Amino acid sequence: PDVVGFRLNGALNFGVTATDMTLRIVEMLREHGVVGKFVEFFGQGMAALSLPDRATIANMAPEYGATCGFFPVDDNTLAYMRLSGREEDDVAGVEAYCRAQGLWYDSSSPEKSYTAVLELDLSTVQPALAGPKRPQDRVDLSNMAQHFKESLTHEVGHSGHGLSESDLSKSTLIGNEYDLNHGDVVIAAITSCCLLYTSPSPRDVEE
């Protein structure tokens, strides 16, 4: 299959989460088109990403349409193996094997030949959400309020609900205590074994 390289540079700014980063990557890969292709992430920006951060990105391969998304093995990978209790002999074996097979990555690694290369400076990633209907429709958090208001009356489609102005004033009475309207936030337990939105990176939880 075609292999698309995705070069990561820089580092995320404080307060920007792995989810924000992943939504930006999904947006870029959807725009480029990676259906039926592999995506390999590389670049000096990898060093700033923990293994859970990388897993968050790889886990979203169905959302950006690729057959798979993966990261080469590096020192962070080995550190995670040690953290998870692997024996040093096992860690050394993984390193030796990956170096021999060309799966190892560090700052001295030559760039491979890819079908195409995309590039993202992680310092440019902004806090964001996606939707209202598709994960690749990323919206900066600073624009979310206006985007939400416009999506209510926009024609039905990927980013619209087709409501009339009169619909916006309608509300739903829940029991005898709560009056819900468009835009109200309701907290519910919606769980999944694998979705990004219910399986955040530890970085997201800590922040």
Tell where the protein language model's regions lie, with residue ranges.
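Mobile "lid/hinge" segments at catalytic clefts and subdomain interfaces of large enzymes
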Residues: 1-90, 194
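Active-site lining segments that contact anionic ligands and/or coordinate catalytic metals
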Residues: 3, 36, 115-117, 136, ...
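Generic recognition of flexible, low-complexity loop/linker segments
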Residues: 27-29, 46, 105-109, 117, ...
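Terminal amphipathic helices with adjacent charged low-complexity linkers/tails
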Residues: 49-55, 62-153, 157
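Non-catalytic terminal/interface segments that mediate subunit docking, oligomerization
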Residues: 123-199
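Single conserved hydrophobic/aromatic residue that forms the stacking wall/gate
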Residues: 197-207
